From Swiss-Prot:
It comes from Pseudomonas aeruginosa (strain UCBPP-PA14). HAMAP family: DNA_mis_repair (MF_00149). Keywords: DNA damage, DNA repair. InterPro entries: DNA_mismatch_repair_CS, DNA_mismatch_repair_MutL, DNA_mismatch_S5_2-like, HATPase_C_sf, MutL/Mlh/PMS, MutL/Mlh/Pms-like, MutL_C, MutL_C_dimsub. Belongs to the DNA mismatch repair MutL/HexB family. SUPFAM superfamilies: ATPase domain of HSP90 chaperone/DNA topoisomerase II/histidine kinase (SSF55874), DNA mismatch repair protein MutL (SSF118116), Ribosomal protein S5 domain 2-like (SSF54211). One of its GO terms (biological process) is mismatch repair. Residues 385-396 have a biased composition (Gly residues). This is DNA mismatch repair protein MutL.
Amino acid sequence: MSETPRIQLLSPRLANQIAAGEVVERPASVAKELLENSLDAGSRRIDVEVEQGGIKLLRVRDDGRGIPADDLPLALARHATSKIRELEDLERVMSLGFRGEALASISSVARLTMTSRTADAGEAWQVETEGRDMQPRVQPAAHPVGTSVEVRDLFFNTPARRKFLRAEKTEFDHLQEVIKRLALARFDVAFHLRHNGKTIFALHEARDELARARRVGAVCGQAFLEQALPIEVERNGLHLWGWVGLPTFSRSQPDLQYFYVNGRMVRDKLVAHAVRQAYRDVLYNGRHPTFVLFFEVDPAVVDVNVHPTKHEVRFRDSRMVHDFLYGTLHRALGEVRPDDQLAPPGATSLTEPRPTGAAAGEFGPQGEMRLAESVLESPAARVGWSGGSSASGGSSGYSAYTRPEAPPSLAEAGGAYKAYFAPLPAGEAPAALPESAQDIPPLGYALAQLKGIYILAENAHGLVLVDMHAAHERITYERLKVAMASEGLRGQPLLVPESIAVSEREADCAEEHSSWFQRLGFELQRLGPESLAIRQIPALLKQAEATQLVRDVIADLLEYGTSDRIQAHLNELLGTMACHGAVRANRRLTLPEMNALLRDMEITERSGQCNHGRPTWTQLGLDELDKLFLRGR
């Protein structure tokens, strides 16, 4: 029988190397910790120099406050920090770092040299370590005010960790992504990156709104900026601002999603769920939304100390945060209209509430053009850049693109269109399109129908192509949703109630949310500590698997405090009804019918995509048409 192992203290060197496994995974992890220290030091410019993807060399130089000579050795000790003093400080921490273990972990697995000088010091001082096998040596050095940290030969003393590193290009891509994330978090700081002697990018300080937009374009691509909707909303102490990509600018991977909480980038499942819900009706299956969003909240109501790499946070009132994020993004996306997507470059949309669904002009089956008798006011609030300052300072630099107060009625639009094409009196010159773009509807006037599928229209920008079935499907779908919301859900009692075996926690959750289930057409009754009975279901969902649906909804309520599964099932059914009720391919439409459909699209929420996330229309500008025919060359 083998001897029982005895408990003993680990050596400081081994303890640091084990701790490094949590903090230092690859060169990108080192860059993150060093850059966060530079930002916490009040830097206004940070230079990063990399060799071999950061494996051979990673040097970060800043112009921050610097570190006093006496504190340099202490900076490399574990759990030594200048950012917090007591537990209460942790509850309101705003610095990116606060644990005091990053430099100790890095210096235990690499050759580290740190040089620093404060503003009141006559000279700089330098400290060197080499894998914790040597005591830190402090000596005078030449350096301007600020700090430089040089990390060489990462994992030189831990071969097992080094062999898990990927190719140089892969490691550099990860490192570059870290710098981009921080560059978006701090518009007021300049970032410069060099790799193997070559300048990769130089991002200058961005103080005003236009400069911030340029940085977003430099980091995320100009295409994102051109297809993004700027938003800013503040309510009940919660402030959300940034850019959300239009549904037509989706990605196959979630690689263009940046979300910051008080300046700290996080990947939180609560946030991901809220964003996914907001885009639910407009994204094609398997596609991912794009966004750069900044969420600001009182530090006392968010816990950032829940993950070793601080990528996750915990909100005190997660339900309120979830509903605020979902509601803001859902309204912003719902208020996008064709004229937002056709607005002049540099303009942002300040959208007003407008009628939707049944309130929109109806596209009649026989070419009738009429307005609904009752107008349902949209509850959406104004979404757009306000004139106030944002988190990074400065005021809005965007000019407002203002829509007409109300779209013309369909009868007026049809009359104007008929007059435009009416035979001219003898000797009268041909009519020209209005000189002002504001006199032409965003989707223009119909010219013809192609193959019984597409509508060709002319607007101020050029040619518009519309998938008439997809467009009418979205219009019908939105009307059905409005009708369901106004009339409520009718419940259907079950002749034989269905019983469900659940855990006691799940039963408590169902009982707590019984009124919520009731509003959605369900009636649940608790039979015992671990059993429920379904006595009523929504009439529209009589074909659904009620037992599994209730289980899934309860799981969501326990996880997120809310659930959209019932609504998703209802929307799926309404989508099917809309698809069958929409105008079919190969149906010949008259010009008034086509124009009625275009006007409906202009005042219907989410009309840019059908119920399945496919685009309903596209624009071919005159420049694009000229290129096709080699004009102007």
